[in-house]
């Protein structure tokens, strides 16, 4: 049994052990987790496995009963940090059983040609395309197996007093419901209601940045019961200032995300504009999507905004904590939003296992996490530039080839993407490694260039002077 995990299976249900019941001088904490998405349900599961009473609140209906899930991308890229968090609660293999491995990027140029850039040619590691709904259902089903978790769907947080641990919700009948908790954990997304309470507290630092790029989701359907493109890749159509990506789904379709500056979206006024734009920029994707389906999907909704949020501290005394997007929302271009949020839970669980006083535990979490959270927010911004533009440049291909060669020769030379996606190395250390590698390569190339000049000069002098 992992350190700090104090539950056991009894008659098919997870029951807290006696050690859990004795925690905190003979009583368990009552924890309120706000938000039953991926991070919230995972956090609830971990708190309950440590013996706490958990109330899990979600303002939407139970995703397992929803006919249509609105507002969020339907598939995600699961990497090592998320896998580690799922493995800790015994769910990794269940999730991977229905996930689709993506071994690299397949790049599509404007002429319709494609080429492959593998993520990890050395160890053959890959990302996994997972359905948001399916993953959320797996986590919620695991929560249902624990008797000390109570789920409250369609309960919207309307107010909270963090000092007192009191909350008020609006239930489906539009009635006010009062609740109390020893610890309030906000996992309620980029526009977190819990974080809004933190903003009003002294010493809380907060910044947000909207980028000038929006996104729309389209779909490449299956054909004759199969994928229309190779399934085991993240497909990218890089076009300098904009791009399109596609991830495979279990039903043999692809979820397509078109990311462009809002001014380009605004320039597409009608069906003819749209079709001409796709014929010019995405000629190979147009017949896969289908003209009529493209028109329907493109004009049925407006482009969505993307925001990057940084804040600190993540806690208030021993009363409240924020995790996931509530603490560090990021643009989706490194595929780390979900993975970073799940890693929050892993780190918090490890610190809780130290059994420090709760105020020290939460303070240690903030101190241990904020620099890494800031780092991945910055990396996500950078990767958007890389995906839409740099991936099609020869310099990017050269650096990728060089990183792969050096990684093969010197295992300690871990490329940036590998360290972020295929390890649990702290994000700030990933950046520090990249800076060190850049400096070393500059020195090597500088010395090589200088040696070439000196050698060339010497040869010239011998021959002509």
From Swiss-Prot:
Keywords from the UniProt entry: FAD, Flavoprotein, Membrane, Mitochondrion, Monooxygenase, NADP, Oxidoreductase, Pyridine nucleotide biosynthesis, Transmembrane, Transmembrane helix
Record field: transmembrane: 405-427, 440-462
Superkingdom of the organism of origin: Eukaryota
Reactions it catalyzes: L-kynurenine + NADPH + O2 + H(+) = 3-hydroxy-L-kynurenine + NADP(+) + H2O
Cofactor: FAD
E.C. code: 1.14.13.9
Family: Belongs to the aromatic-ring hydroxylase family. KMO subfamily.
Described purpose of this protein according to its UniProt entry: Catalyzes the hydroxylation of L-kynurenine (L-Kyn) to form 3-hydroxy-L-kynurenine (L-3OHKyn). Required for synthesis of quinolinic acid.
The name this protein goes by in its record: Kynurenine 3-monooxygenase
Organism listed in the record: Drosophila melanogaster
Underlying gene: cn
């Amino acid at each position: 049994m992992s350190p700090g995990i104090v539950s056991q299976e009894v008659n098919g249900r997870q029951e807290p052990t006696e050690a859990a019941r004795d925690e905190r001088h003979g009583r368990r904490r009552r924890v309120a987790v706000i938000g039953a998405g991926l991070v919230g349900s995972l956090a609830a599961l971990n708190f309950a496995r440590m013996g706490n009473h958990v109330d899990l609140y979600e303002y939407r209906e139970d995703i397992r009963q929803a006919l249509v899930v609105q507002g969020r991308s339907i598939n995600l890229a699961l990497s090592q940090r998320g896998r580690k968090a799922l493995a800790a609660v015994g769910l990794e293999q269940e999730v991977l059983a229905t996930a689709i491995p993506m071994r690299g990027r397949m790049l599509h140029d404007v002429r319709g040609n494609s080429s492959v850039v593998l993520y990890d040619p050395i160890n053959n590691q890959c990302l996994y395309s997972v359905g948001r709904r399916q993953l959320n259902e797996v986590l919620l089903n695991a929560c249902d197996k624990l008797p000390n978790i109570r789920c409250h769907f369609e309960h919207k947080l309307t107010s909270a007093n963090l000092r007192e641990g009191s909350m008020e919700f609006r239930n489906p009948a539009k009635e006010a419901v009062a609740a109390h908790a020893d610890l309030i954990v906000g996992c309620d997304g980029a526009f977190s209601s819990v974080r809004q309470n933190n903003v009003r507290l002294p010493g809380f630092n907060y910044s947000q940045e909207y980028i000038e790029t929006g996104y729309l989701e389209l779909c490449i359907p299956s054909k004759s019961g199969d994928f229309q493109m190779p399934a085991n890749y993240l497909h990218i159509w890089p076009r300098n200032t904009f791009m399109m990506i596609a991830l495979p789904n279990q039903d043999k379709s692809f979820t397509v995300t078109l990311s462009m500056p809002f001014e380009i979206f605004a320039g597409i006024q009608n069906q003819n504009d749209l079709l001409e734009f796709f014929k010019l920029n995405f000629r190979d994707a147009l017949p896969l999507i289908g003209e009529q389906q493209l028109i329907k999907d493109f004009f049925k909704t407006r482009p969505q905004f993307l925001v990057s949020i940084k804040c600190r501290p993540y806690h208030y005394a021993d009363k409240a904590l924020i995790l996931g997007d509530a603490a560090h929302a990021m643009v989706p271009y490194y595929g780390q939003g979900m993975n970073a949020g799940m890693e929050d839970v892993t780190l918090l669980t490890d610190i809780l296992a130290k059994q420090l006083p709760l105020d020290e535990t939460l303070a240690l979490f903030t101190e241990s996490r904020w620099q890494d959270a800031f780092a991945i927010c910055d990396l996500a911004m950078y990767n958007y530039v890389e995906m839409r533009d740099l991936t099609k440049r020869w310099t990017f291909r050269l650096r990728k080839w060089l990183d792969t060669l050096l990684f093969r020769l010197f295992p300690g030379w871990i490329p940036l993407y590998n360290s972020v996606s295929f390890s649990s190395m702290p994000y700030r250390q990933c950046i520090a490694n990249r800076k060190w590698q850049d400096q070393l390569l500059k020195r090597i190339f500088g010395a090589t260039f200088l040696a070439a000049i000196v050698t060339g000069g010497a040869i010239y002098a011998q021959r002509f002077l």
